């Protein structure tokens, strides 16, 4: 019999189009100002609201998804693909909602699913994403899926009086 932790590692996921009527689930996961910035960048105010998220999703280049556990059909995360143009897409706002499910390899599965879905949305030659330099777990996850740090594209945000540096990571196809 598999141990509980090994069973968690064996979980498979799929992407389901996000529906605004379920936004409260997303809002409940983003439960601190720091997590909001890490998840969405500096463009939102805490607490996240349905109105702000609805406005955000009015951009038709954004393809939002819930991340769903294939075994239980439980919604466990959120992510977006932004079509920059036909040759480039950006992965944004990757989040496994339940902290107990983080660090179990689901992020790698999510990145793979997003790469496959990106190919259905466009014909990208490059997939990019942004990550804060202190988010080492995410950086390792993205590197394991072939993304390379591009420090020439970086930004700094002020979060609670501290500077957070982010940089771009690229996957060339």
Give the positions of each predicted feature:
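Terminal substrate-recognition subdomain of acyl/acetyltransferases
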Residues: 2-5, 162-173
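Acetyl-CoA-dependent GNAT
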Residues: 9, 13, 17-23, 28-100, ...
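Solvent-exposed beta-strand sheet faces enriched in polar/charged residues
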Residues: 82, 128-130, 150
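Active-site acidic-Proline motif in GNAT/NAT acetyltransferases
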Residues: 97-100, 104, 133-134
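Glycine-rich acyl-CoA binding loop
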Residues: 105-111
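Conserved active-site alpha-helix within GNAT-family acetyltransferase domains
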Residues: 108, 133-151
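Conserved GNAT acetyl-CoA-binding A-motif
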Residues: 120-130
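Conserved beta-strand-loop-alpha-helix junction that forms the acyl-donor binding cleft
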Residues: 128-139, 156-161
């Amino acid at each position: 019999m598999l141990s509980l932790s090994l069973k968690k590692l064996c979980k498979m996921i799929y992407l389901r189009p996000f529906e605004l009527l379920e936004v409260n689930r997303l809002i409940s996961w983003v439960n601190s100002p720091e997590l909001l910035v890490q998840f969405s960048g500096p463009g939102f105010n805490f607490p996240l609201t349905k109105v702000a998220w609805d406005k955000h999703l009015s951009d038709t280049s954004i393809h939002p998804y819930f991340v769903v556990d294939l075994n239980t059909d439980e919604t466990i995360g959120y992510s977006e693909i932004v079509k920059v143009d036909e040759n480039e897409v950006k992965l944004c706002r990757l989040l496994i909602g339940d902290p107990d499910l983080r660090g179990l390899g689901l992020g790698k599965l999510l990145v793979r699913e997003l790469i496959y879905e990106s190919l259905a949305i466009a014909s990208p030659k490059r997939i990019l994403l942004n990550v804060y330099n202190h988010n080492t777990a995410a950086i390792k996850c993205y590197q394991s899926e072939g993304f390379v740090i591009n420090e020439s594209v970086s930004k700094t945000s002020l979060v609670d009086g501290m500077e957070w540096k982010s940089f771009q990571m690229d996957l060339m196809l």
